[in-house]
Amino acid sequence: MKLAESMYAGPAHIGTLRVASSFRNVHAIMHAPLGDDYFNVMRSMLERERDFTPVTASIVDRHVLARGSQEKVVENIQRKDKEESPDLILLTPTCTSSILQEDLQNFVNRASETSTSDVLLADVNHYRVNELQAADRTLEQIVRFYIEKTRAKDPGSPDPGGAGRRQASSSTESGTEENLKGACGGEKTKKPSANILGMFTLGFHNQHDCRELKRLLAELDIEVNEVIPEGGLVSNLKNLPKAWFNIVPYREVGLMTAVYLEKEFGMPYTSTTPMGIIQTSAFIREMALMCHEVYNNSSTKCSQTDFESCLISNTKKVPKTYINKQTHFVSQAGWFARSIDCQNLTGQKTVVFGDATHAASMTKILVREMGIHVVCAGTYCKHDADWFREQVSGFCDQVLITDDHSQIGDIISQIEPAAIFGTQMERHIGK
């Protein structure tokens, strides 16, 4: 066991609840003892939203231990179904209540018989994954559930998944056209469009990043099809395959969903994080290539005139022209890199630590765009260690993969860097 103070990523049920509470009209029921039900207070304090956090704790007490949980869990699901009328009720245990080894899937099946809402059990191993891994898995599970539900309602529709699998073994033109059709036989959007996967509650600057992504896509004449899970409706998940491609801003959450959609519908995706001038340039080029791939291989209703009117239509000229304009006349990144504040750090030693996405991107920005010496770059995402090492290789002297705050504290005290780019924990260490 670890003290909550020393944890970079929380237990698995926190990730599941973050995804559930990000969707609109979704209610989560947490099967847990007293002490595990702090998510409501934490989210209300940090997000400061007007609405109540849609999470109910089904408390495991002495009566439950004596008689079993089924009656209480089913009763709570049915009560919330009548009171809230949510589109989806998500049941999740915690690592503590998992010790009871109860058949929660049976509870869900029983509650589903009398509930008008969909009822789903979060399929997460609470002893093997952390908060971020559980969030990634839960989002993919919810998307899979509603796409399969839509297919089951319309069994006569074409099977894009089958077409996608056929395309892997056969490059026939008809297979390609079937594969690139939208949800359950629907067509792609007329204009180039994208889904943004992985924006959710309590995320690090997720709202600001989403706003900037939407602005970037609008300037490139790319429509936003769906943003999930933050502010999304589960009833709209069937529309995900209508987009031309998927954007995964953060590897931690959304990557499994993008891989699933690629496998089932042949939808390309990019997991390049547009942080910094160089990575934003690569991000724009990837989007241009994906748009051309879909336009050339699919039966979209986008006319050649409409497509060529989009800024993204010229894969060679547009990214270079757009990026040069943004760098020299719009963005202040180049100005900041030459400012006194930044030049004071030029050649100085720094330490970077955080989640894999932000730590890797920040390391590259500091080295390539600001000329700052990164002595140590690290992440607490141990499950993504190989990718992180590959990304920061050649940009730092030392790579640290750990979720123990004392190790990064020791390294900071040894190096004595001029600046620390890290989490709240590193802020306390630096003081």
UniProtKB/Swiss-Prot annotation:
GO molecular function, one term: 4 iron, 4 sulfur cluster binding
Major subcellular location class: plastid
Gene3D superfamilies assigned to the protein according to its UniProt record, in alphabetical order: 1.20.89.20, Nitrogenase molybdenum iron protein domain (3.40.50.1980)
Cofactor(s) demanded: [4Fe-4S] cluster
GO biological process: light-independent chlorophyll biosynthetic process; photosynthesis, dark reaction
Listed EC numbers: 1.3.7.7
GO CC, one annotated term: chloroplast
Protein name: Light-independent protochlorophyllide reductase subunit B
Organism listed in the record: Chlamydomonas applanata
Lineage, highest ranks first: Eukaryota, Viridiplantae, Chlorophyta, core chlorophytes, Chlorophyceae
Name of the coding gene: chlB
